[in-house]
Amino acid sequence: MTEAKTEIMPRPQMSGAEMVELCKRHTMYEWSVQSKIDPIPVAKAEGVYFWTPEGKRYLDFNSQLMCSNIGHSHPRVVHAIQTQAAKLCYANPFMATEPRARLGKKLASICPGDIDSFFFTNGGAEANENAIRIARAVTGRHKIMVRYRSYHGGTAGALTMTGDPRRWFTEPGIPGVIRAPEFHKYGRKDPEPLEACIRDLEDVIRYEGGQNIAAFLMETVVGTNGILIPPDGYMKAVRELCDKHGILLIADEVMAGFGRTGKWFAVEHWGVVPDMITMAKGLTSAYVQLGAVGMRAPVAQAFKDRAFPGGLTYNSHTLACATALATIAVYEDEGLMAQAVKLGGILRERMKELEKKHPSVGATRSIGLFGIFEIVRDRRTFEPMAPFNGHSEEMTALGAFFREQGLYTFVRWNTFFTNPPLVITEAQLHEGLDIVDRGLDITDRAVKA
């Protein structure tokens, strides 16, 4: 068994134990029982790796929270942050700045179709909140259609629009949110037939009244709820259904955008232009917080002669906009879209090999460098290795093995993710998957005979 690598590092001000103790004493960890949290202390990061204060190295196989797309501490982005901070950190959103102007123009050039107006936020949840507010203002309608297997952010409205169990404790939430089934049902290996998927959507629209629905908010490729990739024809049919009823289509690309699937935005794989597109995470590769709502011309023009219904102190934050510009330049100049396609093919091939080798792997899914393993006790029944919204000894042991071996990824319910930074090399990709290969021996032992 290969041990995780350890480096001798200059001693920081705090040890790892001190970091953990003080963080747990004085700060809250999200979505977690505070007495059970066991965070990894992080002192520095570079490329696809990060290190503890004591020098233990981890391969970041999840790009932190699917956001560090260009890797850690990229010198070009660090320099852009330093340069902008020395010149102008902040100007209020009623002013004009060069980074804001240049970023708006740049996003207009890379977004699908005629999306060319942007409202900047602090992150993905705020982007989705503002997108539905815009949709309601433009259409004069109130209802927002979403899907069950989804996550749209941690603010009040975004959580209401979220389908997964993180919304439960906030219910009833904001009014007007209606839910439709996902194209890939929980506990099944494959998506539903296309005709059945569209029929489900048509039923919800019929029962709720298409004339009452302002927007359909959807993750183009569903992220934390399973890396669910829409079947061919689905996005086109959704676009046609929205057009038929005058419903605005909002593509949540917070996680799937900026090269993660091998395109600037995942929706480009299916040749569909949404009315609005939301983004964050890879927009700055999480170096500085920034999100955005992109709007097609007809949506943006609705506010030419009336007030735009939103505002934030940090809207169009100067330092964040400069960071985004530098990040986008890295994607372009280093060919990271092509890199995601090339290495995504290698990732998919090795994931399928591991699926064949290990009986506990019920399914693997990936598009670009956006992937997931689904772990089961029985391939015939697709019984999950851990229950919906729950844990199991086997999945806990698998996560502990990854951590011991220096592989960082997200283990959730009966799944774990393969979402490395786009700058990963083929050798580094195999390094991570070799650890996965050994770890799956743990879950294989729990497979029913």
Can you annotate each of these PLM segments?
Residues T2-A449:
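Conserved N-terminal phosphate-binding loop of PLP-dependent enzymes in the Aspartate aminotransferase
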